[in-house]
Amino acid sequence: MNYQDFISEQTEYYHLPVPFELEGGGVLTGVQVAYRTWGKLNSAGDNGVLICHALTGSADADEWWEGLLGANKALDSDRDFIICSNILGSCYGTTGATSINPQTGIPYGASFPAITIRDMVRLQAALIQHLGIKSLQLVIGGSLGGMQVLEWALLYPEIVQAIAPIATSGRHSAWCIGLSEAQRQAIYADPNWKGGNYTKEQPPSQGLAVARMMAMSAYRSWQSFTARFGRQYDAVADQFAIASYLQHHGQKLVQRFDANTYITLTQAMDSHDVAQGRDYKSVLQSIKQPALVVAIDSDILYPPTEQQELADFIPDAQLGWLQSSYGHDAFLIDIATLSQLVINFRQSLSLKTFSDVTT
């Protein structure tokens, strides 16, 4: 599998000039970051907007969040300098399990070290510094992207002016960890897994496909599956329509994603806890930036109680809602509603800034 085929031609690359130390104690050398930008950085370097992508996403935010960014949109490329980088550990251009290990000359594979959400954010910060960005007007992202958003607020308060964590939590729940582990076990059970030391020609495709089927079931909702499929039967495939749908999405992921990468990133998500041994409420209360926390009423993966908790504990937070039957994936589907939430939030920030200046 050549994952370069799924990276746009507009993608740029930054090569970290120094070794990158991981939170767990490991060190990566020759780290590469794949990223995209839209708009222009102003002379003050303070019009940055950072998009953080989810589990199987890439730096090509104009493809998976097309309605949210562009000229005169919520993330306005006429006004903002918008950045989206492929996260550490992914397979779309940034150093990860499919990358060549400079110490061995072969892909890392199963030897790629454990990483955390903080590691992802710290590497993004190195890119932001390289690009000459002095201030990020907004850091925004959903799901795994939302976890990065929260860590950005905590790690770099001097850079981040506002945040929008969407359909996410401050720490991964037992529910999410359990679902992730079941997906990983599906991959491990594939005969081609071989402890993660599989070949490019014979990856654990069936295991990864089943993992994706499990994930898709959690990304949607009872309402959406019932309304779309009910008990429809696919006579050609001789199975229920919902089975055909899930199998289709499983096979789609196999064509574009790597199993070791899936393991690495889901384990990083499971490690997510903004407190890390500190008092959870106090850590969230230390976030000083204005925050738009977005909840999805039908999300069974990161239920609204988790976003309500964030909005309750972050001092300057407001809770926005996506009323949708699409479940967790609504933040990638109901773009019109999400766009309006972001537009309203950014307008409120402008009004607040004007008020602060004139009073």
Swiss-Prot record:
Its localization reads:
Cytoplasm
Role description: Transfers an acetyl group from acetyl-CoA to L-homoserine, forming acetyl-L-homoserine.
Naturally occurring in which organism (per UniProt):
Trichormus variabilis (strain ATCC 29413 / PCC 7937)
The record ties this protein, via PANTHER family, to: HOMOSERINE O-ACETYLTRANSFERASE
Output the HAMAP family linked to this UniProt entry.
MetX_acyltransf
Protein name, per record:
Homoserine O-acetyltransferase
Which Pfam families did the record assign? Abhydrolase_1 (PF00561)
GO terms of biological process kind: homoserine metabolic process; methionine biosynthetic process
Under the subunit heading, UniProt states: Homodimer.
Is the keyword Calcium in the record?
A: no
